[in-house]
Amino acid sequence: MSEYLLEMRNIGKEFNGVKALDGIYLKVRAGECVELCGENGAGKSTLMKVPSGVYPHGTWTGEIFWEGKELKASGIRDTEAAGIVIIHQELMMVPHLSVAENIFLGCEPTTGGFIDYDQMNARAAELLARLKINDINVALPVYHYSGGKQQLIEIAKAINKNAKLLILDEPTSALTASETRVLIDLIKDFKKQGMACVYISHKLDEVAEISDTVTVIRDGAHIATRPMSELTTPDIITMMVGREMKNLFPREPHDIGEVMFEARNISCWDVTNPGRKVVDDVSFALRRGEILGIAGLVGAGRTELVSSLFGVWPGACQGQVFLEGKEIKIRTPRDAVRQGICMVPEDHKRDGILPIMPVGHNMTISVLDRFSLRGLIDKDAELVAIQREILRLKVKTADPMLAIASLSGGNQQKAVLSKMMLPDPKVLILDEPTRGVDVGAKYEIYKLIFALARQGVSILMVSSEMPEVLGISDRVLVIGEGKLRGDFPNENLTQEKVLAAAIGKPATNAA
């Protein structure tokens, strides 16, 4: 019997003549968790679509061996029958079907030729109980549940398919800390039962906790495979980016001027429960060239607050907004952009891009009037601007006219940043700007934020990553249960002090 459950040898893959994978090797033993590391666009997701059958045999080069025998899968049905199941970064749920229907989709139990819903619900509940998931009603539609709960439902679906190898692509990018904990504990249990796992994540603390082996790829090529016990986080980062990165937060001095933007008594109401406030009488000021971080627990009201300031919160809002001392009215994003306020949304795939449009057009869509002459677009001038932005943000794309959906998540995020920087904003709102982005791309985004601050742009940044908030902010607002719980200059500010304010413990207002 083979030592390895899965062995991939010399795997290559091309798209339109461009090499995405070039001679990659990967080995996974039963009961082992292999972490696949690399920058955005390195080829991690592309590589995992090979053994999972998304790319059938013949569309790639090399060899795959499964339980010692060569695997030539013609599609996902073949690989799932073998026991290889992938859970993509974008969850494959049917929102209006029940939890049980999603778990058994395509393999529904039947009686007399009809779907047996009682049996399906009972088996789904039993499956979730086996996974120690007791707070999900299998009869409810999936859309009732958070992204974290949906991730667990996807895992239950994989277990129902008798998975021997579970491939998880950025499983915790949109999860809360408690949801992440549940997922990590599940993976540890799976390993004890002999299930193997390939885990893709940019959160290197998770990598250290659950991985036995780390394989690093860069620009589609295999860089190294090492036992996790021999590596430190800086070692992994150096292999990923090809250079030593001593300081993740490249702080540079920048002048902070007069008040540029002011929000007074902002309140917002829940869309589904109009009697409940999600933002409750929040006021703050933002100065020219200042980086103002907004911290708080998930669900505290941070996204709701910044969405209202950009005119995208769908519920009722009230309060006043001032720009350079003058009151302004913002009812739509168009109003905000015209006033010099731009925003990079939390969910860039849903709210920030037009997936089937080219990368370049996604960048310039907010400033097309700049390239317009008598109603016609000057394509040459537009292309010059696009190429300049691609170089400035180091967006990895073979061609700016490729659909943006073909790019990795991190490169899509850079394109969204570019779109919101091209209008030359006075105020830039960033909601989770580095979510799902690798360490190298984070570093580039941080450098960009500091460069904008030096140019006098006022930056309002929401982040759930506390080191990020403390690493780049000049001042930190803390939101809890929709209220402003703290306003702290970032001098000797600690995670403990921010967390204490977020959960409602006494915290001194220091600004």
From Swiss-Prot:
Binding locations of ATP: G38, E39, N40, G41, A42, G43, K44, S45
Principal location class: membrane
Keywords recorded for this protein, A-Z: ATP-binding, Cell inner membrane, Cell membrane, Membrane, Nucleotide-binding, Repeat, Sugar transport, Translocase, Transport
Record Pfam families: ABC_tran (PF00005)
Organism from which the protein derives: Brucella suis biovar 1 (strain 1330)
GO cellular component terms given for this protein: plasma membrane
Location of the protein in the cell: Cell inner membrane
The keyword ATP-binding is annotated on this UniProt entry: yes
Enzyme Commission number(s) of this protein: 7.5.2.10
Name listed for the protein in its UniProt record: Xylose import ATP-binding protein XylG
Family membership: Belongs to the ABC transporter superfamily. Xylose importer (TC 3.A.1.2.4) family.
Molecular-function annotations in GO: ABC-type D-xylose transporter activity; ATP binding; ATP hydrolysis activity
Keyword Nucleotide-binding part of the UniProt annotation: yes
Top-level lineage group: Bacteria
Catalytic activity annotation: D-xylose(out) + ATP + H2O = D-xylose(in) + ADP + phosphate + H(+)
Binding partners and assembly: The complex is composed of two ATP-binding proteins (XylG), two transmembrane proteins (XylH) and a solute-binding protein (XylF).
Membrane topology: Peripheral membrane protein
ABC transporter domain: residues covered: 6-244, 261-506
Function (record text): Part of the ABC transporter complex XylFGH involved in xylose import. Responsible for energy coupling to the transport system.
